[in-house]
Amino acid sequence: MSHMEKIKKYYEENNVEGYPDYYILGWESEAAQELRFKQLVGDIDLNGKTILDVGCGTGNLLEYISRQFKTFNYTGSDVLPHMIQRAGEKKLDGKFICMDLFKSNPYGNKTFDVVFSSGIFNLNLENNQEFLMDAVDIFQNLAREAVSFNLLWDKSKDKDPKYFYFSPEEVQENLSSKYRDTWRVSIIKGYLHNDFTVHLS
């Protein structure tokens, strides 16, 4: 089974009519999802910014941002058509595109002020470390001001083999080494027992 087939199978099995968004997206609760969003945004002032949300799902991050900020330009991308359809049905103030950014990137360097991504590195694809570094390379090329994403923490007490868990220390070392001349890498921990957030600024 290819990586894309794994991703589609996982999320299509979760796509149950009438179930809440957090379940469809594979999160444990709406409260946990909100905590993740709070850390993703952090102290970034998004007013007047252009935003790319990679793996936008059903548009929940846009809903969160819209409660905090009023003037911004949001684009969400996802590889799954049913996610984009559900996001579009909400009539939110943003643009949703079904595409695989990692196969075909239509954007030029520094197109967006901020790039967010929540949850796309969670499934165990057997090459997660490589995928992470390749993805961050794309994110930082697209972003003018900041990149923010979250990962599952290898100190989680309830690990599941279908997910991949990262070491915050290793991630910080690898990214700081690669982008020492261009980005400051920060790790945020402690808001959930199984999750941490990475900021490039």
Describe the role of every protein-language-model region.
Residues 1-21:
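N-terminal, positively charged/glycine-rich alpha-helical extensions of SAM-dependent methyltransferases
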Residues 31-47:
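Conserved alpha-helix/loop element of class I SAM-dependent methyltransferases that forms part
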Residues 52, 59-103:
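Class I SAM-dependent methyltransferase SAM/SAH-binding core
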Residues 103-109:
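Short conserved loop adjoining the S-adenosyl-L-methionine
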Residues 114-128:
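A short SAM/SAH-binding and catalytic strip from SAM-dependent methyltransferases
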Residues 143-152:
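Conserved beta-strand signature within the Rossmann-like core of class I S-adenosyl-L-methionine
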Residues 163-179:
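Short alpha-helix
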Residues 187-201:
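Core SAM-dependent methyltransferase catalytic element
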